[in-house]
């Protein structure tokens, strides 16, 4: 998901999406441990999405506009 797309979301929607991505990451890690995960790059992509969401939320807290 692109940062420009995420900037259109409200803070509440971003927080909900953040929780969803964290749950998804946990499930992916379980699948990896069980040997069921075939596409391991999904872990990397999910972690990057989490970082993007956290960055946008922090920018809004500090009043930084992009």
Curated annotation (Swiss-Prot):
One of its GO terms (molecular function) is structural constituent of ribosome. Transmembrane segments: none annotated. CDD domains: Ribosomal_L29_HIP. GO terms for cellular component: cytosolic large ribosomal subunit. GO terms for biological process: translation. The keyword Nucleotide-binding does not apply. Keywords: Ribonucleoprotein, Ribosomal protein. Belongs to the universal ribosomal protein uL29 family. PANTHER family: 60S RIBOSOMAL PROTEIN L35/50S RIBOSOMAL PROTEIN L29, LARGE RIBOSOMAL SUBUNIT PROTEIN UL29C. This is Large ribosomal subunit protein uL29. It comes from Thermotoga neapolitana (strain ATCC 49049 / DSM 4359 / NBRC 107923 / NS-E).
